[in-house]
Design a protein with these regions (language model features):
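Small-residue-enriched hydrophobic alpha-helices in membranes
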Residues: 1-33, 37-147
Length: 147
């Protein structure tokens, strides 16, 4: 029983310490689901984002827990505003990192449909980032894929 309490306490600490990360992951998941095709490739990109953006070393188990928490959070929300509010508070480099991974997710199926492009424009607007920056990041990812 004590072990169960300690385990639950550890899970709460993981979630409490990573609220902003969970919201960023939820935004990525939302983008992945916008074309109604949430693939393993997109999940892999999101897990890579967790590893890159985490402030401390996380083991695979913690990464999966964060991913599951974010998926649950994304399912229960009907708008992106709460996710972008967290990202908007962050520095420019973090915002660029989020945009980069959003584009990696969107372009993971080699195309960007109207809904995905509209989502990216909305996100850039909510984060007060110019479309030009988003376009440059998108082109960099396309060039990287074509190497």
């Amino acid at each position: 029983m004590i072990l169960n309490l300690l385990k639950k306490d550890r899970e709460l600490n993981l979630e409490e310490k990573n609220v902003d990360l969970i919201k960023m992951i939820s935004l990525l998941i939302h983008a992945a689901k916008i074309d109604e095709n949430y693939t393993e490739k997109e999940k892999s990109i999101i897990m890579n984002f967790i590893e890159v953006s985490s402030k401390k070393e996380l083991d695979k188990k913690d990464i999966f827990k964060l991913m599951n928490n974010a998926e649950t959070h994304e399912k229960s929300s009907n708008q992106i505003l709460e996710y972008t509010q967290e990202v908007k508070k962050m520095d420019l480099e973090t915002k660029k990192l989020v945009l980069e991974f959003l584009w990696k997710i969107i372009l993971s199926d080699e195309k960007s449909d109207v809904y995905e492009s509209t989502l990216m424009r909305r996100i850039c607007g909510l984060l007060y980032l110019p479309d030009k920056l988003s376009g440059e990041i998108k082109l960099d990812i396309i060039k990287e894929k074509n190497k």
